[in-house]
UniProtKB/Swiss-Prot annotation:
This is Phosphoglucomutase 1. Binds 1 Mg(2+) ion per subunit. The lineage of its organism: Eukaryota, Metazoa, Ecdysozoa, Arthropoda, Hexapoda. Changing residue 240 to L: In strain: dpf95_38.3 and dpf95_4.2. Changing residue 52 to V: In strain: dpf95_48.2, dpf95_100.3 and hfl97_93.0. Monomer. Changing residue 465 to S: In strain: dpf95_29.3. It comes from Drosophila melanogaster.
Amino acid sequence: MSLTVEIVATKPYEGQKPGTSGLRKKVKVFTQPNYTENFVQAILEANGAALAGSTLVVGGDGRFYCKEAAELIVRLSAANGVSKLLVGQNGILSTPAVSSLIRHNKALGGIVLTASHNPGGPENDFGIKFNCENGGPAPDAFTNHIYKITTEIKEYKLVRNLQIDISKVGVTSFDIAGKPFTVEVIDSVANYVRHMEEIFDFAKLKDFVSGKATGKPLKMRIDAMNGVTGSYVREIFLNRLGATESSVVHTTPLPDFGGLHPDPNLTYAKDLVDTVAQGDYDIGAAFDGDGDRNMIIGSKAFFVTPSDSLAVIAHYLEAIPYFQKNGVQGFARSMPTASAVDLVGRKLGKEVFEVPTGWKYFGNLMDAGRLCLCGEESFGTGSNHIREKDGIWAVLAWISVMQHTGKGIEDILKQHWSVYGRNYFTRYDYEECASDPCNEMVATMEKTITAPEFVGKSYSSGGKTYKVKEADNFSYTDPVDKSVATKQGLRIVFEDGSRIVVRLSGTGSSGATVRLYIDSYEKENVLGQASVMLKPLIDIALEISQLPKFTGRNAPTVIT
């Protein structure tokens, strides 16, 4: 029986402008009449003529409204000329798995249902983003096109009576107004696990994890935080690498993440940190809701900053078979990320790129063959195996480094610092501040730091003096396509390489989040306590930015 396409009249909603990684709003916003339909229709239309006969991947992190949205996307895609959908079972796919599937199946792109590390549940957040045919987040030009369509939309297309059960793996074919349309519901983890087996030496890692190679099993604590990674964690760490059941926790994806805030940092992954601090563990790791972020801690909860994690993996990349085979190209980091990887790149003779915040900025460099490893201070690490950051990949990389060196995490870091020096780093987040005063703060600070007399000025605190070398509102010209991104964050660089960065974040769903980044480099004094080493620069940053005055906050919501 041929199913018919229905054209439904609609009106634009204000504010459907995708941020750094898609559109994130409260569930109550997405469930307004036609709200999700409008945005998905805009995504489909933005693909233009390429949409007809195409294959798309659909899946998300399992948060509240994920399954309903996935089923809605099936009905909209059928009506808009898509030929085939690959849908994760129950609508579940990690963001790295979507990227891998797009590339493996040469799909036109993927619609990812996630608000990443933001809380889930009926009162919390939902999100939709589009990944392009390279597997990476849509670039600015594409998301701007989506937004333009949302402001002008008058109708969307729907096959209302298309029935599909996405809880069962299998292929279902339909006739949509005389054209074939196929929905393949796939095992959420199979393709991704195969991909990891191609990158890492699972046999060697299994011998290391089980203790067969060393006589002592690797004691790990992997916390999926009730996000999408649960089933991936169980298949890889338990079934493939032979870890014990007690090595993994919170591995059932839940619509509200079991009340957890799936953001892998010292504040929200406190349960993991406390457990590893008090127990006998070699490595602890946590992931966010959609599986692209990771936090690594060593024995007794020794914290590895994301910038140090990136630098250490860069130093040991050739311990991973994928890089032995494909070679090591350049490295990159987001601008606010401490510059530890720059020092590794310099030593190894590799290009190092500094890009704006947002994983999409790494994609062009990867596609051009100039970049194979990159990371962000916001707990994102990844390589050119896909075009997204990848939490599980990062943990497998760390276990590979531990196996290769025969050392624990703290010793690996101390050896690294003895060679390269140490970037002490912290980030202060002031969440859900009033937007207008925050914008005024940034404007005032920009005026201060771009005044001609600011460069050369010295600031002193806690017995340390820092002299300003340069200061600006960071802008970036893509070396590949020459596109320009401006106003990416205020930064002050001092003569010793230390830095202060202030940004307003675009990933929250309400209010503004002010992020203050402090990066202090020490060549010799590498074993100090981070909070003590950073305090002078933090005090200077609060003085220059006048942050307490504008936000009304005397302390950050989160310290990382």
